[in-house]
Amino acid sequence: MNKKLKNNLEKKIRVIPNFPKKGIQFQDITSITDSKQLFTEVVNEISKYCKKNKFTKVAGIEARGFIFGSAVAYKLGLPFIPIRKKGKLPGKIVKQKYKLEYGMDEIQIHKHSITFRDKVLIVDDLIATGGTASAAAKLISKLGVKKIEFFMIIDLWNLKGSKKISKSYQIRSLM
């Protein structure tokens, strides 16, 4: 990994305690998108990995995964697949339910957007407990995809999400 980029990210990303609720340490990634240089470096780093590993599609988890995933897809001339929250996509969809701290949620993609031949890189801003990431991989697997990997900006390693995901999928992060 790019140590200079990691150091720059660690300096720039603001941590907001108790937002949006008590006990959460919110990682504010707008300091990345506010900086042309830092945003470009992040997109370039993910793009380099994506190109090297010959992914055919880039998926992004709603909402902040859209920011980085779509930029990577654009840079490489690849299709971008939005992984949306329940009720946000018209037409034929594939869905996956997953557990939240209090209850259940669901994510969806268009059924026609991915085929079994695709190699999909899932991009998001961070991984915490791994629940949403795991659901995203299961969702894409339902379409027969064999190569699925993750690239996150931030790994909140103390919440063990990356450890959970790495049992089944390759996962990379910038910090």
Task: Indicate where each model-derived feature is located.
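Short glycine-rich phosphate-binding loop at a beta-alpha junction
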Residues: K54-E62
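Short, glycine/charge-rich flexible loops or terminal/linker lids adjacent to PRPP-binding catalytic cores
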Residues: I81-V120
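Active-site-facing substrate-recognition patch
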Residues: M1-F55
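Short, hinge-like loop/turn segments at secondary-structure boundaries
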Residues: L76-G77, K97-E101, S166-Y169
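Short Gly/Thr/Asp-enriched flexible loops that form oxyanion-binding sites at enzyme active sites
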Residues: I67-L76
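Structural motif
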Residues: T56-K57, K119-L121
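PRPP-dependent phosphoribosyltransferase catalytic core
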Residues: F19, S134-M175
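Conserved G/P- and acidic residue-centered "switch" motifs that form tight phosphate/ATP-binding loops
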Residues: D125, G130
